[in-house]
């Protein structure tokens, strides 16, 4: 298959789940996975791609169980936001060790730990080839990190949100449960809604749809997949505005 000589995206928003960082571990951060992801991001920077990153926090904290046990949802979400900051610190450190300039911004003030989120500063950093990691979600409870990824993607005028998952893209059914499940190459926003496919939560998905922000779902566990996506190769599932 012919490949493009240049990346097809100039500016991307990469959404990593917290679970992706834990690798084979049941909890926390797998250092080898973290370093591999940092190297893959470095490849994009060397190609001239501007990279924003949003990381979830599910590897360190999951509020659903505590909410069922009676914890206030707002408190649980604030704890989840802090988990994303911890993951962001780890990713920033991994990027620095890979000799990639990276800045960590938080939607909630954490002076002395990371920068406060600033749209203008983020744009300036991206234009100068810095990787910008956006943490603490949207800064508000009741919003997922997928919503944060779409919001930041729209704000920084990213060409696409790249949602890194543990599967090869969007399937007609859960491939772990249904051997007949079909992997989609492309889908419109409307097709995703009509088929009730699980891409991301509805608030996040609607935000992307309303601003015609394409989403590509791919498997980050496949070495080189991120680069292939950015170079326009047929990797994962593209969700777009028809």
Curated annotation (Swiss-Prot):
Subcellular location: Cytoplasm
EC assignment: 2.7.4.22
GO molecular function: ATP binding; UMP kinase activity
Chief location category: cytoplasm
Annotated binding of ATP, by residue: 15-18, 58, 62, 165, 171, 174
Annotated UMP binding sites: 57, 77, 138-145
HAMAP family: PyrH_B (MF_01220_B)
Name of the protein in its database record: Uridylate kinase
Gene: pyrH
């Amino acid at each position: 298959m012919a490949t493009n000589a240049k990346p097809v995206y100039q500016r991307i928003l990469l959404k990593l789940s917290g679970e992706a960082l834990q690798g084979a571990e049941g909890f926390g951060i797998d250092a080898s996975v973290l370093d591999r992801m940092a190297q893959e991001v470095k490849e994009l920077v060397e190609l001239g791609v501007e990279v924003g990153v949003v990381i979830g926090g599910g590897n360190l904290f999951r509020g659903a169980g505590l909410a069922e046990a009676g914890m206030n949802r707002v408190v649980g979400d604030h704890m989840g936001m802090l988990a994303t900051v911890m993951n962001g610190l780890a990713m920033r450190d991994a990027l620095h060790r890979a000799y990639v300039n990276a800045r960590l911004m938080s939607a909630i003030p954490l002076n002395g730990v990371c920068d406060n989120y600033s749209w203008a500063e983020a744009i300036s950093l991206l234009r100068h080839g810095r990787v910008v990691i956006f943490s603490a979600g949207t800064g508000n409870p009741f919003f997922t990190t997928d919503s944060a990824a779409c919001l930041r993607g729209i704000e920084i005028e990213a060409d696409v949100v790249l949602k890194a998952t543990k599967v090869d893209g969007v399937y007609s059914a859960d491939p772990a449960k249904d051997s007949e499940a079909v992997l989609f190459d492309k889908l419109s926003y409307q097709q995703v809604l009509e088929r009730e496919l699980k891409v991301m939560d509805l608030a996040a998905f609607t935000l992307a749809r309303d601003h015609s922000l394409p989403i590509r779902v791919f498997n980050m566990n496949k070495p080189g997949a991120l680069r292939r996506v950015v170079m326009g190769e047929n990797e994962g599932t593209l969700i777009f505005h028809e």
